[in-house]
Amino acid sequence: MDSKLQLFAKVLLKEHYDEFLEMIQLFNIDKRTFVLQHRKMFEKGWYDTSSEDNEFSEVDIMLCFAIVSHRMAVIDWSGEEYSGQVKRSITMMLKNYGIERFLWNTKKFEDSLDWDKIRRGDYLPLLFQAMNKQLNRGGYSIVFCDTKSDCFRYAILPTAEFVQFENTELDDYLTIISPKIYNIYLADKGNELPKIMLYLKKKFSVPLSEIKEFCSRDKILLGIGNSI
């Protein structure tokens, strides 16, 4: 097993880690049989086991096992199936850290939304960011396991543990990222470049070194995305 995957799985799965290692051993002995025997686990992780063309990896095993162990959850990019779905799943994950009850305070965030401008797929990134800010105050962080698919796979880690893995790539397939969003709109640098850079730093909390690199390019692609 890749050393980075091993370290992250140990931090993510905690007391379930040894069981995960046993599953990996069985998977590597006979992958086809393993997938057939654990079809429900893969389905809960939103993996299609019906096609023989699908090749699963140790990273896939970790993601699916984390979900059935309530260490991770998955949701479609377009939005919640029911109101409060994300809060409920994160509240469940916090119980792994002995937090039986977490008082969410997202009313200010909800009231600030202009629903006439919120398009399909816009709400979840904003919700994750608002919830992450509240969790950060208690020493925890939302962690995205980004597989470049049309869903969010998210977990909760103590912030001190998460920072060790932020922006780490596993198996050239999964990237561990935060839900922080940068919204940068820059049409014309003109003669006001220092003021623009200062504004971006204060407005969006983007590191100045990143802003300088961004503004130094001859051609700039603008958009909304995650922190990497």
Residue positions per predicted region:
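Acidic, proline/glycine-rich low-complexity IDRs
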Residues: 1, 116-181
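Short glycine-rich, low-complexity/disordered patches
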Residues: 21-41, 102-118, 135-152, 179, ...
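A short, ordered amphipathic alpha-helix with a cationic face
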Residues: 9-10, 153-154, 184-189
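Short, amphipathic alpha-helical interaction segments embedded in low-complexity terminal/linker regions
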Residues: 178-228
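Residues at alpha-helix termini
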Residues: 96, 137, 171, 202-203
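N-terminal "domain-start" segment
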Residues: 1-102
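Surface-exposed, low-hydrophobicity interaction/linker segments
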Residues: 75-143
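Generic preference for hydrophobic/aromatic residues in regular secondary structure cores
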Residues: 47, 61-63, 67, 75, ...
